[in-house]
Amino acid sequence: MGLILSAVTFGGVMKWIGFIAIALLCLMFMIVVHEFGHFVVGRLLGFKVDEFAVGFGPAIFKYTSKKSGVIFSLRCLPLGGFCGFHGENDEEDKPLTKDNFNFHKPWKRILVFIAGAGFNLLSAVVLCTIFFMAYGDMMPKVLMTYQFENGIEQNLQEGDLIIAVDGKSLYSTAVPNDLANRIQKHSDKMNVTIIRDGDKQDIVIYIGDYLSTNAENQVIESRGLGISITYEEYRFGFIESLGRSFVFIFKLFGTIFTSIGAVITGALGVGEAMGGTVTAIQQIAMVSQIGFRGVLFAVCALSANIAIMNLLPIPALDGAHVVFTTIEWVRGKPLNRKVENIIHTIGLICLFALAIILDVVHFVS
């Protein structure tokens, strides 16, 4: 009995270690993509890069490009990476050379700063498109039809898959209850696109009063399409999937900004709206149990999240660097580099502290 229990416990622990390892790799992927964005745009604009590293800590492998002099390294801690621009953190007392990061024009530096978030956003679009092509979106499928009280015959049949209303696609993943929201905008009928026996059809369906049964098997009067539904995966081609990825990310941005606004106004606690690195790893590890589908969806959402959060004007984040560089551009001269570096250092410490506090709060709750 004890041996069996120990084996089960050991197996469960090893499984969770695997999920956490997957989560760490996903997190590292998103951070490396971010840093790669800085690297690519920086090199295209003529910036000198000292090192591009995958991971942190002591280097396991190093390669120096003979053409550019960039050191590419693989480090032992799989917790992200970095792109080290030459002289990026130099202060004013050091003379600027043409290879120095701050020697370049402000608009070039701004492009480099936003490139990381841009690559995160691009990766979110690509991965989201792959997700909708591979797994599709959840479309409402007719399970049962009910008779309208006025005797009108509904044009829907059992097994019909509803994919669009009034020529506009349904977005179940991006917009929960999308079909119900569309129904509320019509009074008695609406045009829908359905898949019936593998064929796409445009039909008119009706809205009316009908009798149905609830969970307690009681007869109740309702108003709607006179159907009960479930949801089924429906895959899309490249163009439709690409469009859906933009809709999903746009809606996600709306949710993020709404949450930020709620935190600012006090309607939502910081701990309810945000989480630290450990929380992100925990979330990815949990969806890993679903399989590759869950991991892919989580990385899509988190990549878009990282893109937005990194552009917020918070010291140590790219958004704050953009603000400081824009001020320099307008003034025609930089702010005190030493003061700016101190501000970013304090911001970084505060962000680390906040991440730890949020992770502790999530763990306790």
State where each predicted segment sits.
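Lipid-exposed faces of alpha-helical membrane segments in multi-pass integral membrane proteins
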Residues: A21, L25, A115, F119, ...
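Small-residue-rich helix-interface/hinge motifs
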Residues: L3-S6, G18-P95, L302, M309-R331
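PDZ peptide-recognition modules
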Residues: G2-V13, D93-W107, A115, F119-G269, ...
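Juxtamembrane boundary at the C-terminal end of a transmembrane helix
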Residues: I357-S365
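Membrane interface segments of multi-pass transport proteins and intramembrane proteases
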Residues: F61-S65, L143-F148, T326-I342
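Small-residue-enriched transmembrane helix starts and helix-helix packing motifs
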Residues: R293-A307
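Residue-level signature of transmembrane alpha-helical entry/exit and packing/kink sites
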Residues: K15, F19-A23, H104-F113, N120, ...
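Hydrophobic alpha-helical segments of integral membrane proteins
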Residues: F52, S73-F82, H86, I110, ...
